[in-house]
Amino acid sequence: MDDLVRWKNRNDRKPLILLGARQVGKTYILKEFGRREYDNVAYINCDNNALVRDLFTPDYNIGRILLTIGAITGVNIQPGKTLIIMDEVQELKRGLASLKYFCEDAPQYHVAVAGSLLGLTLHDGDSYPVGKVNTLNMYPMTFEEFLLARNRKQMVDLLQAQRWDFVKGLRTLYIQHLREYYLVGGMPEAVDKFVQTNDANLVREVQNEILAAYEKDISKHAPAEQVMRIGQVWHSIPSQLAKENRKFIYGVVKKGARAKDYELAIQWLLDAGLVYKVNRVTTLAMPLKIHEEISAFKLFMLDCGLLGAMSLTPPAMLLLPSTDNSGKGDFTENFVCSQMKSLSDLPVFYYSKDNSQLELDFVVQANTAVCPVEVKAEENLQSKSLKTTLSENPDMHGLRFSMSDYREEGRLTNVPLYGARSFLKALKQ
């Protein structure tokens, strides 16, 4: 919501495209933003409203378009006082292209659009209004937002204030809710179902419905020649993450598979917002981006709850502590990745050396510092790779996320997993 308010108040504001996977709550957040920040909202759904089907077909005359939207919605549209929302805009012919004319001819009007798979238009030069729009990315609910949904605002406040002394006293409760988050994830409908019923089976039903909707999107919207390959990559992710080093291996998708056969499939999943890609760096030096190796990467699911549903992981396995970490490392690393990615301006990579066992789960660039990161599912804090990295780089400070309490150990900081996002957000400011 804060990002939307900042967009509203920008002097150079342009029409807004809100990107994000299906069912992360884009429509809800735009309507709520309009309710809080504007006198009224003119909302149209371009997918199920026959009246708007030909809205942009005659021309891009903004005066005519505004009169039509006002007539359809019954809203008196006023510059700066009305939020115009066009939902599922990808279903409306020439809908995205119209944003160029709102930007050039009527910048005083506040226009926001959303839709499923809008990210796929980023590479469509014919319809995407390059340079004429602002974009924001929306992600599944973070762990902190999950806590708020569970009516735990004080626990969120303690994490955001970095009050680790008080956080320690609530350790058992934080861990309980974190394990719940591993099961439920951050898809708003799944979170709401859990809050209302506390029933893991009903949550799984919601998650399976979301996964089915994604499958339908793949078959309906992906290029016909890529549908099978996209499905193969998508279904391979749980197996990819179950491997010890999580690196994406094409042979796991299909025996004998090659990169060139699946590059477009992976890009489609990225553009649809269904996966996160974390590339390898081969050197721990600023800026990390110039040391990026795009051919070596990890693929994570957008949501750990959906990962559990797709992998058929029993809910009890996620809700209870494990003694051997089996089946937990993948969820834990996926969780940390999703919390990092929700901080959209935080560069995230992983690090490994050729012909070496040394590998760091993540490497982040926070301001002018390179921070190596290790992730531990429980409280086994042995971390040979991180220890070696810090020994070889005496000016570097390392991070370890685990179930243990916050503590400083020389140039290594242990942060409890439930405080990972709060800590990283503070670190990059």
Give the predicted meaning of each segment.
Residues 29, 33:
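Hydrophobic positions on the alpha1 helix immediately C-terminal to the Walker A/P-loop
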Residues 48-80:
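Short glycine-rich substrate-engagement loop in P-loop NTPases that contacts/grips substrate
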Residues 122-242:
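Interdomain motor-coupling "hinge/lid" segment immediately C-terminal to the ATP-binding subdomain
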Residues 85, 110-116, 137:
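Structural recognition of the conserved hydrophobic beta-strand(s) that form the central parallel beta-sheet
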Residues 195-359, 363-366:
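Accessory nucleic acid-recognition modules appended to NTPase machines
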Residues 1-11:
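Pre-Walker A adenine-sensing motif
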Residues 26:
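Conserved lysine of the Walker
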Residues 340, 360-379, 398:
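Conserved catalytic cores of phosphodiester-cleaving nucleases, focusing on short active-site segments
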